[in-house]
Amino acid sequence: MQNYSKSEKAFKEAKKVLPGGVNSPVRAFNSVDASPVFMDHGKGAYITDVDGNEYIDYVLSWGPLILGHTDPAVVNAITKAALKGTSFGTPTEIETELAKLVIERVPSIEIVRMVSSGTEATMSAIRLARGYTKREKILKFEGSYHGHGDSLLIKAGSGVATLGLPDSPGVTKGLAADTITVPYNDIEGAKLAFEKYGEEIAAVIVEPVAGNMGVVPPIEGFLEGLRELTTKFGSLLIFDEVMTGFRVDYYSAQGYYVVTPDLTCLGKVIGGGLPVGAYGGKKEIMEQIAPAGSIYQAGTLSGNPLAMNAGFETVRQLTPQHYDVFRTLIKRMEEGLTEISARRQVPLSINKAGSMFGFFFTDQKVINFDTAKTSNLEFFRNYYREMLGQGIFLPPSQFEGVFISTMHTENEIDKTLEAFDTTCKILRG
């Protein structure tokens, strides 16, 4: 049995000075009826808490650590950069080098602007879309989280779903009125929205693989249909690849599905574990941003040299072969989970995309937020605590994606399957 006494003490202290004891809501472990685990250090595919408990890590800092914890080349790049200075507030050459690498790997990006978070990226892309098209309305999909910008916190998936909140107080009615929502994977719903509001819609923002209702890939024709609609009505298509960028494929999700948006938002992996976001796209559109154009966006720490070096070294190391290995490992996980769940009579639905996957305790095929919510949340809570006790660290929410890294091997997958079998046996009796 795991001992969590130091984590419990740390959480008690944190609650005195931080809202809810955390700096991001899902970290509080509320949806699994547990106290959060405070981590101390990580190495490769493993993470260790302050009590000395070691776990196979499938959270990976919510996706950024595609090379695993403390990758030597990334750590070395950060260290060398820090010795020169942590921030200058001026251009640096490494910004250009990372930008070139992003442009090389992401089909839609001709020019890219670096920011400090995924939320900044999506907020800035929305402003750019509105300024470029001279329109105000945005179409998004139910259950998709695009950061905590006000206009995007409408039916926003994992963040609010984990807390059981439909929206966030503080989001004005005016902003909500300019945000149109339809179910994910519902191209007919999108067509109806365009029939009604088409001349007013500045952009459609979509996760090419939804990652904040679990992991939900696009059905055939969905992304292609959005590309056709936005082109027809003169709206921009924005892919939020903050999560899927460099996770789904060497060329990101847009490369894998062969659909090219007008703008792309990035984050997570391109920071190598440090705070980074980016948005980019067609030169004609991106040159509307100041100082090249009149649409304003700025940031004190945008292009921070530590983050740029970490991101460059992370993306540089990734090869097409890594994605072949990711798919092989996740197929092994899927086959094992499917066999065990059938044998233990546990309803289970599994989705996957590149180096990320999601599973739901339901008999239904999960294709949108409504079907994701059919998962047995009480079973998930009990399952989560049992898996944690067996050294498997998963996202503490049914509506978050699960990630692997280049440091995960068949050994970690098999240990996880063994823990899953034991957990199902305990919970099913």
Swiss-Prot record:
Swiss-Prot/TrEMBL catalytic activity = (S)-4-amino-5-oxopentanoate = 5-aminolevulinate
Cellular localisation: Cytoplasm
Superkingdom, natural source: Bacteria
Q: In which pathway does it act?
A: Porphyrin-containing compound metabolism; protoporphyrin-IX biosynthesis; 5-aminolevulinate from L-glutamyl-tRNA(Glu): step 2/2
User: What is the protein's quaternary organization?
Assistant: Homodimer.
Task: State the organism of origin.
Answer: Listeria monocytogenes serovar 1/2a (strain ATCC BAA-679 / EGD-e)
Cofactor(s) of this protein: pyridoxal 5'-phosphate
Q: Name one GO biological process term.
A: protoporphyrinogen IX biosynthetic process
Which keywords describe this protein according to UniProt?
Cytoplasm, Isomerase, Porphyrin biosynthesis, Pyridoxal phosphate
EC class of the enzyme, as a word: isomerase
Show the InterPro entries listed in the entry. Answer: 4pyrrol_synth_GluAld_NH2Trfase, Aminotrans_3, Aminotrans_3_PPA_site, PyrdxlP-dep_Trfase, PyrdxlP-dep_Trfase_major, PyrdxlP-dep_Trfase_small
Q: Name one GO cellular component term.
A: cytoplasm
Zinc recorded as keyword: no
Statement: the UniProt record of this protein carries the keyword Isomerase: yes
GO molecular-function terms, A-Z: glutamate-1-semialdehyde 2,1-aminomutase activity; pyridoxal phosphate binding; transaminase activity
Q: What is its EC number?
A: 5.4.3.8
Residues with the modification N6-(pyridoxal phosphate)lysine, per the entry, are: K268
Family to which the UniProt record says this protein belongs: Belongs to the class-III pyridoxal-phosphate-dependent aminotransferase family. HemL subfamily.
Name the record gives this protein: Glutamate-1-semialdehyde 2,1-aminomutase 1
